[in-house]
Amino acid sequence: MDYRNGLRRFNTDRRSRLFPSSAFGFLLALMLFSLAGLLPWKQWFVLEGNWKNGEITSAVGKLYDKEHPARNYAVGLWALVSYTLFGEGQKGLFVGKDGWLFIKEELEPSAHEHQEVEAARELIEIVKSHFAENESQLLITVIPAKWRVVPENLGEKEIAPDIALRRSYLLDAFSNKQAVGQQDIAVFDAYETMRDLGEKAFLRTDTHWTPQATESVAERLSQSIRQQFTDLSYDQTSFEWQRSDPEIFRGDLYNFLPLGRGLEMFGPSPDLIETKQLVLTHEAINGAINNTENILFDGLSFPVNLVGTSYSANERWHFADALQKSLGMEIPNHAQEGKGPFQPMLEYLVSEEFIESPPELVIWEIPERYMGVEGNQKVLEEYRSKQS
């Protein structure tokens, strides 16, 4: 049974029954009546912005920060009208078809797009140079943008050329050798795998992929690794999934729709996300007990390490777990949330763990959108300041 589609149909039908188009006028009148009593009239004549890009909602929120404790209720009403009448959320959110939400930094060039791309390229060259100086090998896993996997859910939204080129920029950065001694960099592009999954690849209300997508990507990535890196010790242990019932999940993009309690039912339907846990099989547990003496004398060895973003760091998606299961080995996870792909890698390369015991292979997960978003120049400047 497709739980996500079932929940979507249920909530869509429910909204159509509870909130028909004939009620829009009533809602608008109620909202204006409520807010008129809470804000001085003179404040309404200084509101600047555009309904359709969320600026009015943000402006009302700022007024309530200063004027009245009923801010959450008022802003929730404004957000509801903006979403239901205009199909828009707060600034930073794009509302697609059938309740699909997208973050605008994936759809629109940043203020300094070209400079951020150049900074990303330089950071990549720095990382490549580090690996050229040691025996560890690097494998890049490119995560496609959400819009690229489900473009049909964008509606009439057009993608700017700079945005469409981000994936090519990233792939090209690892195919070019700009320094003497740089080794070939293995690249796994997850686009085909995720495109095959269609709407099951990404969560509708979140920027991230689904647990089903991480399993599929990890399986195909593991096949590629086994073919390219034949000397690694695979299948040293065995894992299995303990699966539970799906849970209702409201993703991070709900933050751009501050409907508040009581109004969420009129917003996009939440996702249903698979819940599971990776555990050792009974055979693996028995084997670990028998090998305890060898581990004590020889120490632990982890031939593969993972570095990346919240796509790998957040345990809700289970990417690191899926890789461990597919490769049959424990994989230390150095991914971090909220830092993009470059900062965690630079920190890992100077860590005691990497310097004293470099692994045979490092998997570096990079979402394509980070080639142009704000922040790459800052990471590069901080790196340069530490080197000087």
Question: Positions of the model-derived regions?
Answer:
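Extracellular glycan-modifying ectodomains
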Residues: 1-388
